[in-house]
Amino acid sequence: MKLHLYNTLTRTKEVFNPQDPANIKMYVCGPTVYDNPHIGNSRSVVVYDLLYRIIIKIFGKKAVKYVRNITDVDDKIIDRAELLGITINDLTDKVTREFHINMEYLGCMLPTIEPKATEHIDVMIEIIERLIAKDHAYIADNHVYFDVLSAPNYTELSNRNLEAMFEGVRIENSKTKKNPQDFVLWKPAKKNEPENINFTSPWGLGRPGWHIECSAMSYKYLGQNFDIHGGGADLIFPHHTNEIAQSRCAFPSSTYAKYWIHNGFLTVNGSKMSKSLGNFITVRDLMDKQIQGEVVRLFLLSSHYRRPLDYNDKAIDDAKKTLDYWYRAIEHINVQKVDLPSNFMRSLFDDMNTPLAIKIINDYAKCVFISKTEAERKFNASAIITCANFIGLMRKTQYEWFNRDVDEFYINELINKRLKAKKQKNWLLADKIRNQLLEKKIILEDKSNYITIWRKE
């Protein structure tokens, strides 16, 4: 049984043949940390978390290097920090922490490496200098631009002609550009900007363009060639197209990534969920409603990853009912881990066909309720928990699941927030959190050394 993945670059479903089975390399575009992630952003993280699990199953964890970056330098970050009246570092640290909390809530594994853009400026400068030396980039009006027309096969990933690619795309106008489509590799500092958002370079004080960041970090940790590059379908153009162009031009012998995997949009009433449209729901919103993270994860896996997925209350409720059914099926059964069933693995090996994988788990649940012997019930229940665990679900006990008013993740997060408030002598906030938990019949007991325990009333 071999893993098949749809490769956007070739527009075909291919057998996954890594360059080195003992050293598999995967890069996924991570968040720009200017605001709390919405669940559309989180779909990408959950999809590639599943792919990571599948590849680990085949090749072993030590053989897989999974890099997911943090973009912590960007005009949106600058604008947001100014709007909130806080420093860039305070904003990016806060949003990065929130991102990690969200991913834990969704049951995502940590990547092998999570590099920050601001810590790799030297690598970006090195690649830009290579591009200038090879006449693929030029300096104009204190900017460094990439010359799009100098890149061979620029349209290969998008499979569209150059004019069509740029229709409806916002292009930065500059009389000094060679071509309107040329994109920025390095931009100069603006007047009255905070000093810590700009960096020294051969072209003066400034900061990198967005696209060069991922080329630099993938090169730093994975080299010139690697196996998988993942991200949302909205990144095919311009971000991934520009990544390929600048990386291949900087390293002419490089093919860059072999397999390009893209997940579909999350929609709301048929429109793409996005902050610019104002139709987004953050992961924090769902956490505050005390919707279980497993429910959201199952919802995000309920549609094939390449298809659009529409967010609505019914879809969330359906995911909750499905998990209720699974947890009820294993109730009062001494389940044990068994080998992953071959039909279940075949579904995941077929371009991560999660709808089929979920149906197979449902079928095992049905079998539990019609099983004629205890051995049959135990086998089917064990298959449920084994399959669900593999895709990051059913991480709770039946007691924890069916006592949803006691969400330990939510409670512990509030306790940590309260402890922080106490250390800062913010007694008003500390009391507010205590009362908030008391309303849910959660009693806090403060011990020495800032330790707090809790119990249900």
Curated annotation (Swiss-Prot):
Principal EC category: ligase
Intervals of motif 'HIGH' region: 31-41
GO aspect biological process, one term: cysteinyl-tRNA aminoacylation
Binding site residues for Zn(2+): 29, 214, 239, 243
One cellular component term from this protein's GO annotations in UniProt: cytosol
Major subcellular location class: cytoplasm
Cofactor: record remark: Binds 1 zinc ion per subunit.
SMART domains (alphabetical): DALR_2
Cystine bridges: none
Cofactors, names only: Zn(2+)
Keyword terms of this UniProt record: Aminoacyl-tRNA synthetase, ATP-binding, Cytoplasm, Ligase, Metal-binding, Nucleotide-binding, Protein biosynthesis, Zinc
Protein name: Cysteine--tRNA ligase
Species annotation: Rickettsia prowazekii (strain Madrid E)
Lineage summary: Bacteria, Pseudomonadati, Pseudomonadota, Alphaproteobacteria, Rickettsiales
